[in-house]
Amino acid sequence: MKPFWSRVWQSAAVVVAALAGLMSMQAQAATPAEIRVDYAYYSPESLVIRHFGWLDDAFKADGTSIRWVLSLGSNRALEYLSSGAVDFGSAAGLASVLARANGNPIHTVYVFSRPEWTALVVRKDSPIRSLADLKGKKIAATRGTDPFLFTLRALHTVGLTRDDVEIVNLQHPDGRTALANGQVDAWAGLDPHMAAAQLDDGARLLYRNVAFNTYGFLNVRDAFASQYPQAVERVLKVYDRARQWIVAHPAETAQIIADESKVSLPVAKLQLQRNDFSDPVPGDTQRAALKAAAPVLTAEQLTKPGVDPAKIVDTLIDPSFARPIVAASH
């Protein structure tokens, strides 16, 4: 009998070991070894979280490290998401639609703000007084970003297209410099650089339209969300903590923005004033705004043939992660 029971106990031990290994694998799958997150001067939450180390604290017990990557614009954030350089990236709504329409496998899981972060900017002594005056002029804009798409939509309101102007593709801070130096006639600005141009350079906002500013989206790679859904939830909890902290501490937030972005405190305060943090769950409001904006992507032939950007909007926006987190915080 002893050999029989010995074999039974040996078999049981193998089963227990296998189950333990499976549970260990499941635990590992719930939390990756590293989470790569972008931070951007146009995303106050990312700056606050990085400043306080809240993501590092949230995942410390799991042994998960946080790697921060600077995004200078939506184009960079979306490139990093596409290449897998980051798992979470901060980008404008319409730029995110364009990226997904052209094959970038991302979902929008959180709205970090409703900003007025872009406008068309000219020098204080510029003779340009209207959008129509831009015909034949040089406009600095970062392709694949909200300011670039804002420019196209603005031109369409007066019957112009990008063929009627010369778009000079420069990253946002370089666009400000080019405007100040007279290398371009106008610039599709982005905060905090736009606020700095206003306050420090005396630049003038030629055309403003809050409705043409699309939302600040936190996007996640589809592969990451599928493999680590619990990690996505935990990251969003930290983002929502930062959002609430910003609302309660505007002065401290402005100082963090100023320090991180290397701008003056008045510039940071102006940037912050142009953000609404009240609606963090992506949903019908964002869908409607983006579907209204989507035709410019087709009209300017920015998407692949046969792709309907309006349909892409529905596949991009995923409120399932943020909704319970925000509801629980109220």
Predicted region positions:
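Solvent-exposed, polar/charged alpha-helical surfaces in well-ordered, non-transmembrane soluble domains
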Residues: 53, 57, 79, 83, ...
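Sec/Tat signal peptide C-region and signal peptidase I cleavage site
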Residues: 25-29
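Secondary-structure end/capping motifs
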Residues: 228-304
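Bacterial N-terminal signal peptides
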Residues: 11-23
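N-terminal secretory signal peptides that target proteins for export/translocation
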Residues: 1-7
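Short, glycine-/small- and polar/acidic-enriched structural segments
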Residues: 30-161, 166-169, 185-188, 205, ...
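Conserved C-terminal helix/tail region of periplasmic/extracytoplasmic solute-binding proteins
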Residues: 298-330
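Pocket-lining segment of extracytoplasmic ligand-binding domains
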Residues: 94, 167-168, 173-260
